[in-house]
A protein has these predicted regions:
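Short loop/turn segments that connect beta-strands within the blades of beta-propeller domains
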Residues: 1-2, 10, 42-43, 51, ...
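Short polar catalytic/cofactor-binding loops
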Residues: 2-4, 21
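Conserved core positions of repeat-based scaffolds
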Residues: 4-7, 16, 45-48, 57, ...
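Short, exposed beta-strand/loop patches in secreted or surface proteins that constitute
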Residues: 6-7, 30, 37-38, 47-48, ...
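Tandem repeat domain/solenoid detector
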Residues: 11-13, 35-38, 51-54, 75-79, ...
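Short, intrinsically disordered, charge-balanced linker/junction segments flanking boundaries
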Residues: 159-169
Length: 169
């Protein structure tokens, strides 16, 4: 986060500090949770995965600080990843859900929304890239920041790890 910090404690609870509107304000209900297993930032929000596979978020709404109701009801989230403006979560079946800044990765293109074999996701400032179980990669979000995979890379099926920087993968 660009203006706040968050820490997950041994007991599965959270503490946060910094700019209140950018993720430091946990609100009235989040401090009582004791089942947080992971937490990640977007630019101005945080998302946390709970032990039961649900996800919660807080911070700036436009950057993913509110989980849409259909996603908040899910109980099969296995990982959550943020970029500068959005979050994406992998579900147990290898599919994806996303929320936050739409043009920066929260709007999943139909072919990517239909996938059921995603094993890892990484984000940069305004795009996401996902590794599939067949060793291929897909990306979406801002094309100028790696949100479109070049054809020679899209044809690869032996990718084992993804990494990115601020504006590229």
């Amino acid at each position: 986060d660009h203006a706040a910090f968050c820490a997950r404690l041994n007991r599965g609870s959270l503490v946060a500090w910094g700019h209140a509107g950018r993720g430091a304000d946990l609100g009235p209900t989040l401090p009582a949770l004791t089942d947080i297993v992971s937490v990640c930032p977007s630019g101005y929000a945080f998302a946390a995965r709970r032990a039961d596979g649900r996800v919660v978020a807080w911070g700036r709404t436009a950057d993913g600080g509110v989980v849409p109701a259909p996603i908040a009801e899910l109980t099969d989230i296995v990982t959550v990843t943020g970029n500068g403006y959005a979050f994406v979560a992998i579900r147990r079946d290898g599919s994806l859900v996303a929320w936050g800044g739409g043009r920066h990765g929260a709007d999943l293109p139909a072919p990517i929304a239909a996938l059921k074999d995603v094993v890892a996701v990484i984000g940069n400032l305004s795009s996401f890239a996902a590794l599939r179980s067949n060793g291929s990669v897909v990306a979406w979000g801002d094309p100028a920041a790696g949100g479109t995979v070049p054809d020679p890379i899209a044809a690869l099926t032996d990718i084992r790890e993804l990494t990115g920087n601020h504006m590229a993968f």
